[in-house]
Amino acid sequence: MRRPPRSLHAFIACACLLLASASVALAEDDSPPEPDGIWQGPLLGPVPATLAGGTVIDTATLADAIGPRGAVLIDVLPAQRRPAGQTTPWMPVPHRNIPHSVWMPGIGSGVITAEMTDYFANRLAELTGQDREKMIVFYCRPNCWASWNAAKRAIANGYRHVNWYPGGVEAWQAAGLPTEVSTPEGPGAQ
């Protein structure tokens, strides 16, 4: 049996690479552009593929950052609230996040109060030891603007090693990595 010419193998390999590149480009084209400032629209929906002034990271990079580099991890998923009008006892489902995270619900909202702004600035200074070069990672859930907004706020506060993990805790869990139960802190916890 005759083998196909090497040029055919090369052609097929090039075609596969072009298709893969086109798929990635199309996926990135589906992402909205970054807004000029903090996103003011609904917090759930398509998010940008970029973070001006910061870095978008994946699960492997995050797992590496947790180890010896000791990154500050901040989960900004909003806290569950008692349903309006509910008179019977209610207890929220325990919130799970990436180990060693600080859960600051509400920090990623489009508009935050002066109290929350001050809390965010002071807590970041405390968590980083006032080191504006310390690696900080913000996350929430997939397609959630809250972590993107919080990362932009940290950049605006002068932090220079700000990272955004857009896959959120779901991507972390999908990789088979552990989570832990967390308690919310700050003004957004009430």
Task: Please place each PLM-identified region on the residue numbering.
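Bacterial N-terminal signal peptides that target proteins for export
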Residues: R2-I12
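Rhodanese-like catalytic fold shared by cysteine-dependent sulfurtransferases
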Residues: R2-R3, S23-T59, A65-P68, P83-V137, ...
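Bacterial N-terminal signal peptides
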Residues: F11-A22
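Structural scaffold elements adjacent to functional motifs in cytosolic proteins
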Residues: L73-D75
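Short, glycine/acidic-enriched loop or turn micro-motifs at the edges of active sites
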Residues: P78
